[in-house]
Amino acid sequence: MNTMTYSVDATAILNELVQRSITQLCHFTTFGNVRSIFKMGALYSRQTLEELRVPADFQDPLRCDGARYINLSIHEVNFRLLSKFAYDQPYAEWCILRLRKEICMRTGVRFTTDNAAAGQVRQYGTAEGVFGLKALFAASVPAKAGCVTRKANKPMNLPTSPQAEVLCPEPIALRDVMDVMVVNWEAKQRLVNKYGIPEALVKVGERCFPSMLRCRSYEGAVMD
């Protein structure tokens, strides 16, 4: 495993995060996946999990360039993307890993103004360093549908496009996980008692989730 190093402009990146009141990065996943994350002691890319034959529900795209990144969002999850996966997997329970913002300061971290699997990203590429981070908050950014214009009332800690991502080279250690958010108290009990996640790390935050997950019932559902 490579020793973690920091970007040459790590200080500038941290200053930008602080000035924008960005307190966390987010990564949504299923209860089954988060159990594997805690067993392995880190988050790994889809490529590595497939090579190790670790059972997982994959949300991150399989990158054709061979790069091993973990897809993260800034300050809150991508509601649209989480809703899509939740619709496609109606019996899966979802949680959100809230990660330390300092991950953005690491060497090799890249920033993209749109979802990493989108054609616009392949066309316009990604960027590293404070330049790449600032680009996420531009007045107008390229996106799948053309361009996304920043709304006047957009909170300063949210990127112009909700599809923006932070691509972090694997692994992300458990020490960078601040907490694990779930949609309600019952979900917390299941994640702690059935999946073995430490209770002190699991927090309830209904507003962190899209509306379709706030009202979903898992009573009688078949889960792993």
Residue ranges and their predicted role:
Residues 2-71, 78-224:
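Active-site-proximal loop/hinge segments that shape catalytic or ion-binding/gating pockets
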